[in-house]
Protein backbone atom coordinates (compact mmCIF):
# COMPACT_ATOMS: atom_id res chain seq x y z
CA UNK A 1 0.00 0.00 0.00
CA UNK A 2 1.42 3.37 -1.05
CA UNK A 3 1.36 6.43 1.20
CA UNK A 4 -1.44 8.88 0.44
CA UNK A 5 -0.82 12.62 0.16
CA UNK A 6 -3.92 14.81 0.02
CA UNK A 7 -3.89 18.28 -1.50
CA UNK A 8 -6.55 20.50 0.04
CA UNK A 9 -8.34 22.74 -2.42
CA UNK A 10 -10.84 24.14 0.15
CA UNK A 11 -12.00 27.51 -1.17
CA UNK A 12 -8.68 28.40 -2.80
CA UNK A 13 -10.42 28.15 -6.18
CA UNK A 14 -12.26 31.36 -5.21
CA UNK A 15 -15.35 30.19 -7.09
CA UNK A 16 -13.54 30.27 -10.42
CA UNK A 17 -13.29 27.09 -12.52
CA UNK A 18 -10.26 28.32 -14.48
CA UNK A 19 -8.44 29.11 -11.27
CA UNK A 20 -9.36 25.68 -9.84
CA UNK A 21 -8.04 23.96 -12.97
CA UNK A 22 -4.83 25.98 -12.77
CA UNK A 23 -4.25 24.88 -9.16
CA UNK A 24 -5.01 21.25 -10.05
CA UNK A 25 -2.64 21.39 -13.02
CA UNK A 26 0.17 22.80 -10.88
CA UNK A 27 -0.32 20.12 -8.23
CA UNK A 28 -0.27 17.50 -10.98
CA UNK A 29 2.97 18.85 -12.45
CA UNK A 30 4.55 18.64 -8.99
CA UNK A 31 3.41 15.07 -8.36
CA UNK A 32 3.39 13.12 -11.62
CA UNK A 33 6.97 11.87 -11.31
CA UNK A 34 6.19 10.37 -7.87
CA UNK A 35 2.98 8.51 -8.80
CA UNK A 36 4.66 5.11 -8.90
CA UNK A 37 5.48 5.31 -5.19
CA UNK A 38 2.88 7.71 -3.73
CA UNK A 39 -0.88 8.05 -4.16
CA UNK A 40 -2.09 11.63 -4.47
CA UNK A 41 -5.59 12.93 -3.92
CA UNK A 42 -7.12 16.34 -4.40
CA UNK A 43 -9.70 17.22 -1.76
CA UNK A 44 -12.66 19.46 -2.29
CA UNK A 45 -15.36 20.70 0.05
CA UNK A 46 -19.05 20.39 -0.72
CA UNK A 47 -21.60 22.65 0.94
CA UNK A 48 -25.24 23.06 0.01
CA UNK A 49 -25.45 26.66 -1.18
CA UNK A 50 -29.16 26.81 -0.35
CA UNK A 51 -28.73 26.03 3.35
CA UNK A 52 -25.10 26.42 4.40
CA UNK A 53 -25.22 30.14 5.14
CA UNK A 54 -28.04 30.88 7.56
CA UNK A 55 -30.78 33.03 6.08
CA UNK A 56 -30.41 35.58 8.89
CA UNK A 57 -26.95 36.57 7.58
CA UNK A 58 -27.31 35.72 3.89
CA UNK A 59 -27.90 39.33 2.84
CA UNK A 60 -25.40 40.70 5.35
CA UNK A 61 -22.61 42.98 4.18
CA UNK A 62 -20.17 41.06 6.36
CA UNK A 63 -17.09 40.53 4.20
CA UNK A 64 -16.66 36.91 5.33
CA UNK A 65 -20.24 36.03 4.35
CA UNK A 66 -19.90 37.78 1.00
CA UNK A 67 -16.53 36.14 0.29
CA UNK A 68 -17.86 32.71 1.22
CA UNK A 69 -20.88 33.12 -1.09
CA UNK A 70 -18.52 33.57 -4.05
CA UNK A 71 -17.00 30.12 -3.54
CA UNK A 72 -20.09 28.03 -4.30
CA UNK A 73 -20.13 26.04 -7.54
CA UNK A 74 -23.21 24.67 -9.26
CA UNK A 75 -23.52 20.91 -9.76
CA UNK A 76 -22.60 21.40 -13.44
CA UNK A 77 -19.48 23.34 -12.48
CA UNK A 78 -18.48 20.66 -9.98
CA UNK A 79 -18.88 18.02 -12.70
CA UNK A 80 -16.41 19.91 -14.90
CA UNK A 81 -13.87 20.11 -12.07
CA UNK A 82 -14.28 16.42 -11.21
CA UNK A 83 -13.86 15.31 -14.82
CA UNK A 84 -10.76 17.51 -15.11
CA UNK A 85 -9.26 16.10 -11.90
CA UNK A 86 -10.17 12.42 -12.18
CA UNK A 87 -7.29 11.32 -14.42
CA UNK A 88 -4.73 13.26 -12.42
CA UNK A 89 -5.62 12.42 -8.82
CA UNK A 90 -7.68 10.26 -6.56
CA UNK A 91 -10.64 12.34 -5.43
CA UNK A 92 -11.52 13.25 -1.86
CA UNK A 93 -14.26 15.48 -0.53
CA UNK A 94 -15.47 16.89 2.76
CA UNK A 95 -19.26 17.20 2.81
CA UNK A 96 -20.65 19.63 5.38
CA UNK A 97 -24.32 18.67 5.15
CA UNK A 98 -26.63 15.84 4.09
CA UNK A 99 -27.21 17.19 0.56
CA UNK A 100 -23.46 17.28 0.06
CA UNK A 101 -23.03 13.69 1.33
CA UNK A 102 -25.51 12.57 -1.32
CA UNK A 103 -23.58 14.50 -3.98
CA UNK A 104 -20.23 13.02 -2.88
CA UNK A 105 -21.72 9.55 -3.35
CA UNK A 106 -23.21 10.46 -6.74
CA UNK A 107 -19.90 11.93 -7.88
CA UNK A 108 -18.02 8.74 -6.94
CA UNK A 109 -15.27 10.24 -4.83
CA UNK A 110 -12.61 7.79 -3.67
CA UNK A 111 -12.43 9.25 -0.17
CA UNK A 112 -14.91 11.03 2.02
CA UNK A 113 -13.40 13.17 4.76
CA UNK A 114 -15.26 14.12 7.89
CA UNK A 115 -14.15 17.58 8.99
CA UNK A 116 -13.02 18.04 12.57
CA UNK A 117 -15.90 20.48 13.08
CA UNK A 118 -18.29 17.65 12.09
CA UNK A 119 -16.74 14.99 14.34
CA UNK A 120 -19.61 15.37 16.81
CA UNK A 121 -22.34 16.25 14.31
CA UNK A 122 -24.31 13.08 15.05
CA UNK A 123 -27.13 13.69 12.55
CA UNK A 124 -24.54 14.10 9.77
CA UNK A 125 -22.48 11.11 10.96
CA UNK A 126 -25.57 8.89 11.14
CA UNK A 127 -26.64 10.04 7.67
CA UNK A 128 -23.16 9.11 6.40
CA UNK A 129 -23.13 5.74 8.15
CA UNK A 130 -26.41 4.71 6.52
CA UNK A 131 -25.29 5.65 3.02
CA UNK A 132 -21.56 5.12 2.62
CA UNK A 133 -20.86 1.76 1.02
CA UNK A 134 -17.68 2.07 -1.04
CA UNK A 135 -15.95 5.29 -0.08
CA UNK A 136 -12.96 5.19 2.21
CA UNK A 137 -13.56 7.51 5.15
CA UNK A 138 -10.99 9.84 6.69
CA UNK A 139 -12.00 11.57 9.90
CA UNK A 140 -10.27 14.64 11.29
CA UNK A 141 -10.26 14.92 15.03
CA UNK A 142 -8.26 18.13 15.42
CA UNK A 143 -9.62 20.19 18.27
CA UNK A 144 -11.82 17.38 19.58
CA UNK A 145 -11.62 16.48 23.22
CA UNK A 146 -10.54 13.00 24.23
CA UNK A 147 -14.13 12.10 25.16
CA UNK A 148 -15.44 13.27 21.81
Functional labels for PLM-detected ranges:
Residues 22-46, 107-108:
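Catalytic domains of carbohydrate-active enzymes, especially glycoside hydrolases
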Residues 95-102:
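Short, glycine/charge-rich beta-strand/loop segments that flank catalytic centers
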Residues 16-18, 73-78, 102, 114-134, ...:
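Active-site-adjacent beta->alpha loops and helix N-cap segments on the catalytic face
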Residues 8, 27, 104:
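Conserved, mostly hydrophobic/aromatic
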Residues 11-15, 36-73, 100, 116:
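Glycine-rich, proline-tolerant flexible connector loops at the mouths of alpha/beta enzymes
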Residues 55-89, 126-141:
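Alpha-helix-loop-beta-strand connector modules within alpha/beta enzyme cores
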Residues 14-30, 76-77:
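Glycine-rich anion/phosphate-binding loops
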Residues 3-7, 40-44, 91-94, 112-114, ...:
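Hydrophobic faces of well-ordered beta-strands that scaffold small-molecule active sites
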Amino acid sequence: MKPLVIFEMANNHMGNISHAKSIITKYYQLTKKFKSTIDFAIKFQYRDSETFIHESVLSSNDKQVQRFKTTFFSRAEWKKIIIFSKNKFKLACTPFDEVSVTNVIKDKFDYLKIASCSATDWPLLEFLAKRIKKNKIICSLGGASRDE
